[in-house]
Regions:
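GH16 jelly-roll
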Residues: 26-286
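Bacterial N-terminal signal peptides
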Residues: 12-21
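C-terminal outer-membrane/trafficking sorting elements
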Residues: 288-334
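Extreme N-terminus of proteins, especially the signal/transit-peptide cleavage junction
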Residues: 3, 41-48, 296-301
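N-terminal targeting leaders of exported, membrane, and organelle-targeted proteins
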Residues: 3, 17, 26-30
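Compositionally biased regions
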Residues: 3, 21-24, 47, 86, ...
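Bacterial N-terminal signal peptides that target proteins for export
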Residues: 2-12
Length: 334
């Protein structure tokens, strides 16, 4: 550590006392480089604590915060991922929204694909197990449209063994949203329901949500239950949803004819995301959150860096945004 950082650590106890009124959610916001929840906004209930959110209120043209979000990786043979790009034209802030696009490729000599699409995820910065995810979004139905708000596991297991939680999908020009669960079980038991949908006009914003508990996944649109998927046994095949942490994915893709139809490659597809928020019940928040704000004590024996609420930061210390962290049993401020 540099001398400057050591001095900061020596002042930690005093600073923690001064910060003792800061909520855990605010601590997470500081560490994730996102702003506090707007005043007057409702939460799911007193049993939940806000542990992550992004309001996407940066100035117009700002790109997604790379300390929180990372661009999804392109996989040419995977439908949703075949056109993914880190181009600033497919993921940016505009009028208080994250805008995700699938656009005609303006330079096929540079990148030989028909379209470029936007997608971002949190696998390296934020993962969690159990809780409630809410995302306020607006989509624009059109032939070939295929936007999604979803989650994947942080696991070495191949798809679909680790599971997949699709909070929201919409296809083509349908006035309908879908909520779906994928696992090895759903693949091998095709006759068993693992998806629900709701017909509704898609010309306005909705809050899409999932409540993820130890034995059930419940999906909502504006508070109305759309679908529920229950645990049937303890197997990895049927219920992988208590075996791994999951991370968030937001993307605007296009179909290929297998579910969503083939796109009009000259059309610009667009999804607007106002905000995304994750809440957890106290029992599901990692126990490191219990470290007193006014006392430094041993809480980890490794050199890994954690947020106060327990999320491991998958980045070098030099890359951390400003905030309060725990490492080597001590809190420090960067």
């Amino acid at each position: 550590m540099s001398q400057k950082k050591n001095i900061k650590r020596m002042l930690t106890v005093l600073i923690m006392a001064l910060l003792s009124t800061i909520s855990f959610a605010q601590d997470v916001n500081l560490a994730n480089g996102v702003e506090p929840l707007p005043s007057g906004e409702q939460t799911p209930g007193s049993e939940y604590t806000l542990v992550f959110h992004d309001e996407f209120n940066e100035p117009n043209g700002t790109l997604p915060n790379t300390k929180v979000w990372r661009y999804c990786t392109r996989y040419p043979k995977v439908i949703w991922a075949r056109f993914l790009s880190s181009s600033p034209e497919v993921a940016y802030m505009q009028d208080g929204n994250l805008v995700l696009c699938a656009i005609p490729n303006p330079d096929k000599l540079k990148d030989n694909v028909e379209m470029l699409s936007g997608g971002i995820e949190t696998s390296q910065s934020f993962t969690f197990r159990f809780g409630r995810v809410e995302c306020r979004a607006l989509v624009n139905p059109f032939i070939g449209n295929f936007p999604a708000i979803w989650m994947m596991p942080k696991t070495t297991l191949g798809w679909p063994k680790g599971g997949e939680i699709d909070i929201f999908e919409q296809i083509d020009n349908e006035q309908r949203c879908y909520a779906t669960v994928h696992s090895a079980w759903t693949q091998s038991h095709g006759n068993e329901p693992h998806s629900g949908n709701l017909r509704m006009p898609m010309n306005r914003y909705y809050i899409y949500a999932v409540e993820w508990e130890e034995d059930v996944l419940t999906f909502f649109v504006d508070g109305k239950r759309v679908y529920q998927y229950k645990k049937q046994n303890d197997s990895q095949e049927q219920w992988p949803f208590d075996k791994s942490n999951f991370y968030l994915i937001l993307n605007q893709s296009v179909g290929n004819g297998s579910w969503a139809k083939k796109p009009d490659v000259n059309h610009t597809y667009e999804m607007l995301i106002d905000w995304i928020r994750v809440y957890q019940k106290q029992k599901h928040i990692p126990t490191v959150i219990s470290v007193p704000m006014t006392k430094i004590k041993e809480c980890t024996e490794s050199n890994d860096v954690y947020l106060l609420q327990g999320t491991k930061m998958e980045m070098k210390e030099s890359e951390l945004p400003k905030g309060i962290y725990v490492s080597n049993g001590k809190k420090f401020i960067k």
